[in-house]
Curated annotation (Swiss-Prot):
InterPro entries: Beta-TrCP_D, F-box-like_dom_sf, F-box_dom, G-protein_beta_WD-40_rep, WD-F-box_domain-protein, WD40/YVTN_repeat-like_dom_sf, WD40_repeat_CS, WD40_repeat_dom_sf. It comes from Homo sapiens (Human). One of its GO terms (biological process) is non-canonical NF-kappaB signal transduction. This is F-box/WD repeat-containing protein 1A. Homodimer. Self-associates. Component of the SCF(BTRC) complex formed of CUL1, SKP1, RBX1 and a BTRC dimer. Direct interaction with SKP1 occurs via the F-box domain. Interacts with phosphorylated ubiquitination substrates SMAD3 and SMAD4. Interacts with phosphorylated ubiquitination substrates CTNNB1, NFKBIA, NFKBIB, NFKBIE, NFKB1/nuclear factor NF-kappa-B p105 subunit, ATF4, CDC25A, DLG1, FBXO5 and SNAI1; the interaction requires the phosphorylation of the 2 serine residues in the substrate destruction motif D-S-G-X(2,3,4)-S. Binds UBQLN1. Interacts with CDC34 and UBE2R2. (Microbial infection) Interacts with vaccinia virus A49; this interaction inhibits NF-kappa-B activation. The gene is BTRC. Transmembrane segments: none annotated. The keyword Phosphoprotein does not apply. It is found in: Cytoplasm; Nucleus. Coiled coil: none annotated. The N-terminal D domain mediates homodimerization.
Length: 605
C-alpha cells in the first residue's frame, strides 16, 4: 500500500476509535454508500479511476507551509465549524494535508483522445507535527455534540477513496455486532437467551453449540435438545409413535426434579441422531419391503374369513364371517373377548373409546360397550346387508346393499335417531366416508357421489371407473378409490377431476387407505401394494415409479387393512390377521448400527 494512503487510513481509524458507539452505524452506512459516489480502485494498474468531472488538481497545500489548528475562544459549534473548514476546504487546508504534506497530489495521464484520466496515488511526506495536530483534532472532536461529530466524520469520509471506504467499512462491521446470547446471561436473562435458541432446528442448534463456551453453556443449561425433541413429539405422529415404542418418551415433558436426578442435556443430544436413524430405517423398510411379520389365526369354527378390522396399540377388533366380533390382545395375539349377537357375517365395524358399532349381512347395526362387550343398541333400518359405516362427532353414516345411505344423529350409544336417507345410486352402496363438509359414497354403479354433510343435499358425481367401486377413503380434498376394474383412482373432490390412475393389481381392489406419504391397497389377488402418494399427485412422475413394494403373504383375498407409520394390519379370506412391522425388522437389527445419513435434516410431511 502507498505510504501516504496508509497514514491517511491510520488517521481515519483513530478518529473512528474516538467516536461513541452510537455514531458508528451512521458512519458505516455512509462508508457503504461511498463506493458508488466516489471512485473504484483498479487492481490492474494500481490507480484510482475518478468518477468526478475534475480538472487537473493542484497540490493540496499549494506550496504553502502547513497551517496550525488553533482553538477558537467562542462556542463549541464555532470550534467545530473552524476545524471542519480546515479539514474540508481545499482552498484553505484539509485535515489530511495538515497532517501529512504532499508534494504531488495528482498525476494525470491523458489518453490519446484526451477525454479520460487516471489518478495516481498521492505521494506524501509525513509532517513532524502530525501527532500534535492529531491529538488537538481529537480533543476538539470529543468536545462536540454527537450530531456535530457525525457531520464531521461524514465530511471526512467523503474525501476518501474507494479502498479507504472499504477498509473503514470492514473495521466498523465488527463494532456494530453484538453477541446477545453471551450478553443476556451476564444481565441475569438466561431464560431469554434459551428461549431465542429454542426456535432453532437441529442443524442450527448443533452449530450454535460450537460458537463459544458461553453458547454451549446456554444450550446445555437450557436443555434445548430436550425441548427440540419435545417439540417434534408434539407436532409429528411419527415421533410420538417412536417415543412410545422405544420408551424414551418417559424422559420428556417433565420438569427437572429437585434432586437434579434427571438425564443431562448430553443424553438428549445423543438421543436425537438415534431417533433420526430410526426414522430413516422405517422409511427404507417401507420402500424395500423389509418387515417382521406376526400372524393371528382366527380359527373360525364354521365359515372362514375376516371381513373387517380396526386396531390401536393395545387391541385389534375384528369382524368375522362366522357372525362374531373378536377382540385380540395386540401384544400377546390372544383373543380376549368374543361378541355374539349378529345372525349374519360382520361386514363392517368402527370403535372409539366408548363403543364398538358393527354392521352385518343380517341388515342390522349393533352398538357394543367397548370395555365390557355388552350390546347396548340395535338399529333396524336397512332392508339388506349393511356394507359399511362411519361415525364421528355425534353423527353416523351407514350404507347398504339396498342402494341407500342412512344418516344418523348419535346423542348417546342408546339414543341414535335417523336424520335422513340419501338415495341416488343405482346399485349397492359399498362404502361411505365423511367429514364436516362432505359425505362421499361409492357404489357398484361405477360412480362416486358427493353430498353436503349439513344439508344432506347432492353435490356432484365423480365418473371414471369402468366397473363397480369397492372401497374408498376421503380426507381434505383427496378421494382415493379402488374398483373391480383393478385400478385405483385419485380424485379432487372440489372439482371432480381424476388426478391419477394407479394400475398394478390383477383383481378387484377391495380395500384402500392413505396418509400423507403413501397409499396402501389390498386386492382379491391376495396382494398388498404400497404406493408413493406424493409422487402419484405429481403429474410429472412416471407411472412405473409409483408402486414402491408389493407384499405377498396372504393365501386368500385381502378384505380389509389399516396402517400407520410403523405397520400394516390386514385381514383376509384365509381367516388370518397379519401384522406387518416396518420398525422392528429382524434382518436390520442383526446388522451393526450405522450413522444416520441425514442426522439433522428430518422434514415432517
Amino acid at each position: 500500500m502507498d505510504p501516504a494512503e496508509a497514514v491517511l487510513q491510520e488517521k481515519a481509524l483513530k478518529f473512528m476509535c474516538s467516536m461513541p458507539r452510537s455514531l458508528w452505524l451512521g458512519c458505516s452506512s455512509l462508508a457503504d454508500s461511498m463506493p458508488s459516489l466516489r471512485c473504484l480502485y483498479n487492481p490492474g494498474t494500481g490507480a484510482l479511476t475518478a468518477f468526478q468531472n475534475s480538472s487537473e488538481r493542484e497540490d493540496c497545500n499549494n506550496g504553502e507551509p502547513p497551517r496550525k489548528i488553533i482553538p477558537e475562544k467562542n462556542s463549541l459549534r464555532q470550534t467545530y465549524n473552524s476545524c471542519a473548514r480546515l479539514c474540508l476546504n481545499q482552498e484553505t487546508v484539509c485535515l489530511a494535508s495538515t497532517a501529512m504534506k504532499t508534494e504531488n497530489c495528482v498525476a494525470k495521464t491523458k489518453l490519446a483522445n484526451g477525454t479520460s484520466s487516471m489518478i495516481v496515488p498521492k505521494q506524501r511526506k509525513l509532517s513532524a507535527s502530525y501527532e500534535k495536530e492529531k491529538e488537538l483534532c481529537v480533543k476538539y472532536f470529543e468536545q462536540w455534540s454527537e450530531s456535530d461529530q457525525v457531520e464531521f466524520v461524514e465530511h471526512l469520509i467523503s474525501q476518501m477513496c474507494h479502498y479507504q471506504h472499504g477498509h473503514i467499512n470492514s473495521y466498523l462491521k465488527p463494532m456494530l455486532q453484538r453477541d446477545f446470547i453471551t450478553a443476556l446471561p451476564a444481565r441475569g436473562l438466561d431464560h431469554i437467551a434459551e428461549n431465542i435458541l429454542s426456535y432453532l432446528d437441529a442443524k442450527s442448534l448443533c452449530a450454535a453449540e460450537l460458537v463459544c463456551k458461553e453458547w454451549y453453556r446456554v444450550t446445555s443449561d437450557g436443555m434445548l435438545w430436550k425441548k427440540l425433541i419435545e417439540r417434534m413429539v408434539r407436532t409429528d405422529s411419527l415421533w410420538r409413535g417412536l417415543a412410545e415404542r422405544r420408551g424414551w418418551g418417559q424422559y420428556l415433558f417433565k420438569n427437572k426434579p429437585p434432586d437434579g436426578n434427571a438425564p443431562p442435556n448430553s443424553f438428549y443430544r445423543a438421543l436425537y441422531p438415534k431417533i433420526i436413524q430410526d426414522i430413516e430405517t422405517i422409511e427404507s423398510n417401507w420402500r424395500c419391503g423389509r418387515h417382521s411379520l406376526q400372524r393371528i389365526h382366527c380359527r373360525s369354527e364354521t365359515s372362514k374369513g375376516v371381513y373387517c378390522l380396526q386396531y390401536d396399540d393395545q387391541k385389534i377388533v375384528s369382524g368375522l364371517r362366522d357372525n362374531t366380533i373378536k377382540i385380540w390382545d395386540k401384544n400377546t395375539l390372544e383373543c380376549k373377548r368374543i361378541l355374539t349377537g349378529h345372525t349374519g357375517s360382520v361386514l363392517c365395524l368402527q370403535y372409539d373409546e366408548r363403543v364398538i358399532i358393527t354392521g352385518s349381512s343380517d341388515s342390522t347395526v349393533r352398538v357394543w360397550d367397548v370395555n365390557t362387550g355388552e350390546m347396548l343398541n340395535t338399529l333396524i333400518h336397512h332392508c339388506e346387508a349393511v356394507l359399511h359405516l362411519r361415525f364421528n362427532n355425534g353423527m353416523m353414516v351407514t350404507c347398504s346393499k339396498d342402494r341407500s345411505i342412512a344418516v344418523w344423529d348419535m346423542a348417546s350409544p342408546t339414543d341414535i335417531t335417523l336424520r335422513r336417507v340419501l338415495v341416488g345410486h343405482r346399485a349397492a352402496v359399498n362404502v361411505v366416508d365423511f367429514d364436516d363438509k362432505y359425505i362421499v359414497s361409492a357404489s357398484g354403479d361405477r360412480t362416486i357421489k358427493v353430498w353436503n354433510t349439513s344439508t344432506c343435499e347432492f353435490v356432484r358425481t365423480l365418473n371414471g371407473h369402468k366397473r363397480g367401486i369397492a372401497c374408498l377413503q376421503y380426507r381434505d380434498r383427496l378421494v382415493v378409490s379402488g374398483s373391480s376394474d383393478n385400478t385405483i383412482r385419485l380424485w379432487d373432490i372440489e372439482c371432480g377431476a381424476c388426478l391419477r390412475v394407479l394400475e398394478g393389481h390383477e383383481e378387484l381392489v377391495r380395500c384402500i387407505r392413505f396418509d400423507n406419504k403413501r397409499i396402501v391397497s389390498g386386492a382379491y389377488d391376495g396382494k398388498i401394494k404400497v404406493w408413493d402418494l406424493v409422487a402419484a399427485l405429481d403429474p410429472r412422475a412416471p407411472a412405473g415409479t409409483l408402486c414402491l413394494r408389493t407384499l405377498v403373504e396372504h393365501s386368500g383375498r385381502v378384505f380389509r387393512l389399516q396402517f400407520d407409520e410403523f405397520q400394516i394390519v390386514s385381514s383376509s379370506h384365509d381367516d388370518t390377521i397379519l401384522i406387518w412391522d416396518f420398525l422392528n425388522d429382524p434382518a436390520a437389527q442383526a446388522e451393526p448400527p450405522r450413522s444416520p445419513s441425514r442426522t439433522y435434516t428430518y422434514i415432517s410431511r
